[in-house]
Every structure is written in C-alpha cells, then in structure tokens.
C-alpha cells in the first residue's frame, strides 16, 4: 500500500501522528539597547537659603542691595549708620525695587529692614516676634 493510503486510514480511525505545526515567524525588529541611568533624588534635601546682612553707609550702595534682591536673595538692611534723610531715600528706593520684583519689605526694628524677593515668604509681624524674643515691650 502506498503511504498516502495508510495515512488516510490512520487519520480516519484517529490514530494518525500529529503533524508538527510550523510557526510563522514574522520579521522581528532588532532590539536596540537603551542606556538608562537611574535617577536618584534625595527627597529630604531642601535648598539652603542664605540671608545677607548689609550695612550701607551711602545711598549709592543701594544698587548692591537691589542686585542681591534681583538674584532672589533676601537681604537684611541695617541703616543705623546712615543719615536719616539718606536712610529714608534708601527705604523708598528698596520699597520700589521690592514692588517691581514682586517682593516685599518689612521693618524689623528702628532702621533695620528685611527686603525679600518673591520666592521668600514672610509671615507674621517681625517686630512682634523680635520683641517677644527679647522682651522689648
């Protein structure tokens, strides 16, 4: 008998050998290696804010204070060594600069002021805080 006839008979009785199915292989795209470095970020670090203390003696030095304010650094300005009229001019100038840069200026005591940029938040009344710390009532 021919092999075809035997295959048909075996298939009819269900005893045929299973044919191996050929898997069709689609064209695969090559895998491109990706150099990925892990990004490790310490969530407990906060940027350290430095507060400058400047003691101008002349009105011409007010530009240095404004430059620090433009660089987003808070500045404590001590005007005690200045003439009262010049000190008033400095305060007026710094008030305008703080306003223009969306910052603020607060009087700490006497002739001492805090000039802060917009990224620096001042809460509460500083004069009350200083007075309560040193019992200056």
UniProtKB/Swiss-Prot annotation:
The keyword Cell cycle applies. Keywords: Cell cycle, Cell division, Cytoplasm, Septation. This is Cell division protein SepF. Homodimer. Interacts with FtsZ. Belongs to the SepF family. The lineage of its organism: Bacteria, Bacillati, Bacillota, Clostridia, Thermoanaerobacterales. It comes from the Bacteria. It comes from Thermoanaerobacter pseudethanolicus (strain ATCC 33223 / 39E). Its main location: cytoplasm. GO terms for biological process: division septum assembly; FtsZ-dependent cytokinesis. Gene3D superfamilies: SepF-like protein (3.30.110.150). Cell division protein that is part of the divisome complex and is recruited early to the Z-ring. Probably stimulates Z-ring formation, perhaps through the cross-linking of FtsZ protofilaments. Its function overlaps with FtsA. It holds the Pfam family SepF. It is found in: Cytoplasm. GO terms for cellular component: cytoplasm.
